[in-house]
């Protein structure tokens, strides 16, 4: 389930996501160009993979025009780090940060997250 609402025009977008984590290999690395992601874990556990976007990965799906998201193919040449997220943790991803949310920690589980998208040019 995903609830999405625009605040202050399109300067802020609030999402409440209830998703199930899964194996890292089933989650797609993504990057945004217009928005900064502030992700807050309300309930659950996940890893978020992340690495600097050096624009060397192959594009799997380009939805920048519609949804400000670009998905990359797997790239074994990048040094992807895994950030553990538990209740009350938050992470901030800028346009130069590739991130892969919803990777399971141990077993797959249902998680609830709040994602605030802040348009870069408002800062």
Kindly give the residue locations of the regions a language model identified.
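Short proline/glycine-enriched turn/loop segments at secondary-structure junctions
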Residues: 103-107
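Conserved metal-binding segment of the jelly-roll/cupin
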Residues: 84-102
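Conserved short histidine dyad/triad with adjacent acidic residue
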Residues: 14-32, 42-58, 95
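Short, conserved beta-strand element in jelly-roll/cupin
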Residues: 33-46, 52-54, 63-74, 117-118
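Short, small-residue-biased leader/transition segments that mark boundaries at the very start
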Residues: 1-3
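A short hydrophobic beta-strand segment most commonly corresponding to one strand
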Residues: 90-92, 108-123
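A short beta-loop-beta micro-motif enriched in histidine and acidic residues
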Residues: 8-9, 25-36, 56-64, 78, ...
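Short acidic (Asp/Glu) patches
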Residues: 15-34, 65-79, 100
